[in-house]
Amino acid sequence: MTLARLAPLAALLLAACAQFQPPPPEPDPLPDLMRQQTSLPQGGGVFTAGGSLSLTSDNRAFRPGDVLTVVLEETTQASKQAGTSFGKKSGAKIGPSLIGNTTFNAQVGIDANRDFNGSSSSTQQNALAGSLTVVVHRVLPNGLLQVKGEKQLTLNQGEEMLRVAGYVRVEDIDTDNRVSSLRIANARIGYSGSGALADANSPGWLMRFFASPLMPF
């Protein structure tokens, strides 16, 4: 009987000791870097159509294997509010008479009143600034560039990982071979970290105990 009483408490303690693991990264939507196909020069020529550069062209990326810099300018802000209120009131009153004589007036009254008020609000704001150099992995038939890149920093207090993937138009690349992250289509931008600094942002075991889904309150 004692073990049956301690079983719910043990389940709550085990849930509190569970670590909050970050969600695993999503599969990379872009393929691996494709090998550039170059044709052999014909007629004793020196330059090839797939690998030569025009003297009048700029240095913007437009072929598989080229690199370009993505300027991160991400800012998101969300706000949501909700409120609910309803009430109900009802009453009944009965005054019976005794054989047509109102001398005996036994009044019976029933009243019911219910009220409910609820409100909620949520606000979230995120910002990410910086730069990351990515590699062109493929050129689509319509000229879009599939780009992908990542940066991993190993610090004395942990590791940080930054990943960027998506599709870029050549027209959106400036003369310094840079493109804004706001111009990337189907952008996949991820920033994560591990170590002492990341652990400092996670709640302790007692807070996880009260935030457990098994908590009845």
Swiss-Prot record:
Which GO cellular component terms, listed alphabetically, does the Swiss-Prot or TrEMBL entry include?
bacterial-type flagellum basal body, distal rod, L ring; cell outer membrane
User: Biological process (GO) annotations?
Assistant: bacterial-type flagellum-dependent cell motility
* Lipid-attached positions, S-diacylglycerol cysteine: 17
Indicate yes or no for the key word Lipoprotein: yes
Q: Does the keyword Lipoprotein apply?
A: yes
InterPro entries reported in the protein's UniProt record: Flag_Lring (IPR000527)
Q: Which UniProt keywords apply?
A: Bacterial flagellum, Cell outer membrane, Lipoprotein, Membrane, Palmitate, Signal
Q: Which Pfam families match?
A: FlgH
The UniProt GO MF terms for this protein read: cytoskeletal motor activity
Q: Where is the lipid attached (N-palmitoyl cysteine)?
A: 17
Indicate where this protein resides in the cell: Cell outer membrane; Bacterial flagellum basal body
Give the range the annotation lists for the signal sequence: 1-16
Bilayer topology annotation: Lipid-anchor
What does the subunit section of this Swiss-Prot or TrEMBL entry state? The basal body constitutes a major portion of the flagellar organelle and consists of four rings (L,P,S, and M) mounted on a central rod.
Q: Which family does it belong to?
A: Belongs to the FlgH family.
- Reported function: Assembles around the rod to form the L-ring and probably protects the motor/basal body from shearing forces during rotation.
Quote the protein name from its UniProt record.
Flagellar L-ring protein 1
Organism expressing this protein natively = Chromobacterium violaceum (strain ATCC 12472 / DSM 30191 / JCM 1249 / CCUG 213 / NBRC 12614 / NCIMB 9131 / NCTC 9757 / MK)
